[in-house]
Amino acid sequence: MAQRYRPRLLEVKVIPIKPDQWEWQVCEDDTPLVMGYETTRETAQIKGDSALFRLLSAG
C-alpha cells in the first residue's frame, strides 16, 4: 500500500517579550524551526515571513 503524503504546515508566530522586544518563530506543529528577536512587531513579522519563504524555497 502506498504511503500517503502529509503536507508540512508551517506558520510564523510573533510573540511579545518586552515592550521593545519581539520574538519571531517559524514553527511546524508547535516546534520552532527558526527563531529570532527584533525591536518592533513589524520587523519581527517581516523577518519571520522572510525565514518562512527561505525554508519553502529550499524545499
Describe every region a protein language model picked out.
Residues 49-59:
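Short arginine-rich
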Residues 29-43, 58:
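A short, exposed loop/beta-hairpin motif centered on an aromatic-Gly-Thr core
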Residues 1-21, 53:
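Short N-terminal "domain-start" leader segments
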Residues 21, 30-31, 50:
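Short linear motifs in intrinsically disordered/low-complexity regions
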